[in-house]
């Protein structure tokens, strides 16, 4: 998925932008944000099902560099997320399980079949330049923002990216058409050669999946 550059500005604790701070400052920001999102534990949210959407597929390759296709990487991470969630007893629906094309409306329609569901769309990023790197989490709506905050904080913690941000995207049809809380996670830039090599490793893919699952569980547990 192509990216647009985002300004590095101060935002609320539930919307975090990281632009390569020194390590102690980075840890302080992350710790404070975790504290804010976890203060006031309430009854767990009722989540009946997690919809895992592996971005692109079939004729839609997504971002690509050489023989590295976003659609393939997204599906690998999606399968890992599914496996981890099922191990926790959480029902999961995949929007696709193979290299097939599904429209954005079709993906949202799958999610909209269920009540008390959440929707996680998994992607990898690219840009015309080769220097951009990091993880990004997009959301739409208030509950989407809360879900994005939990997932993104775990992405920062597990992956330790150089850059990362969360922001609302009103131009992403798959999020707007989904009635349940929905986010889109960009797991790394395959247009950056160093980051692309990391994205291709099973260890990085597993850490992406663990971060997403940890974030889902935190969202489920904390208001």
Give short role names for the model-derived ranges:
Residues 7-29:
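Bacterial N-terminal signal peptides that target proteins for export
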Residues 48-67:
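Short glycine-rich His-centered loop
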Residues 40-44:
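Sec/Tat signal peptide C-region and signal peptidase I cleavage site
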Residues 27-37:
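Bacterial N-terminal signal peptides
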Residues 45-49, 68, 72-223:
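Active-site-proximal helix/loop segments of hydrolytic enzymes
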């Amino acid at each position: 998925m192509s990216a647009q550059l985002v300004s590095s500005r101060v935002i609320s604790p539930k919307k975090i932008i990281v632009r390569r701070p020194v390590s102690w400052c980075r840890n302080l920001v992350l710790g404070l944000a975790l504290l804010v999102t976890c203060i006031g534990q309430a009854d767990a949210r009722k989540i009946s099902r997690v919809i895992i959407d592996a971005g692109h597929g079939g004729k839609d390759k997504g971002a690509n560099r050489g023989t590295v296709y976003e659609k393939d990487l997204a599906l690998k991470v999606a399968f890992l997320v599914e496996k981890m969630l099922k191990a926790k007893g959480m029902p999961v629906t995949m929007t696709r399980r193979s290299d097939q094309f599904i429209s954005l409306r079709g993906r949202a329609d799958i999610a909209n079949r269920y009540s008390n569901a959440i929707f996680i769309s998994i992607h990898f990023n690219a840009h015309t330049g080769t220097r951009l790197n990091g993880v990004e989490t997009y959301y739409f709506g208030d509950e989407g923002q809360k879900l994005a905050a939990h997932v993104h904080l775990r992405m920062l913690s597990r992956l330790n990216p150089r850059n990362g941000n969360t922001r609302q995207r009103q131009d992403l049809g798959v999020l707007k058409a989904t009635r349940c809380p929905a986010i889109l996670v960009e797991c790394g830039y395959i247009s950056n050669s160093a980051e692309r090599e990391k994205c291709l490793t099973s260890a990085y893919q597993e850490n992406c999946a663990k971060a997403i699952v940890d974030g889902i569980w935190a969202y489920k547990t904390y208001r």
